[in-house]
Amino acid sequence: FPGCMIVNRQGARFMNDGANYDETGRAMANAATTPDEPSFYIFDEHYRRNYLAGPMLAMPRLFDGTLPGDVKRIVIKAESLAELAGKLGVDPAGLEAGVARYNSFAQTGVDADFHRGEESYERHYSDPNHTPNSTLGKIGKAPFYGIAVYPGDSGTKGGLATNADAQVLDAAGAAIAGLYAAGNTAASM
């Protein structure tokens, strides 16, 4: 949805954060310098009130005082981007610069870094009423929020091993002619 981004500890986007979960998980795993290093899902009050925000539903009447304690521990809240960065262990100047760059893309509707919104999958998880790009929206209304996110599986998802052309691979790693797997039938990581 428009108005959120995923950054690293330097506060910079490093992938198309609107991509499908397989691509996102791989990008997060590849960007991590240690196996347990999180990425950070960043959004603002406008996003929180209008779209799904991790464990919080988009509920205008849901006040912070009514959030369960475990959600308050997961969702970090701050009155400024610099304060949020400090609470998350992210470089404050990097986060402010990253959000400014993302906001410039939201204004023009063109993600010059990662092309968010150019694929139909990304536009499916967007706001069709938001323009000029239904997947890019400004992050600017305090308070700001951050959630540490980690790559992982979605379900058991053993899945079939495939090559770059979605051909299923046999035990020796050779493509099986005419057999393809995609989505949840293919191994994601």
Range-by-range predicted roles:
Residues 1-189:
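Mobile, glycine/GP-rich and aromatic-enriched active-site lid/loop segments adjacent to catalytic centers
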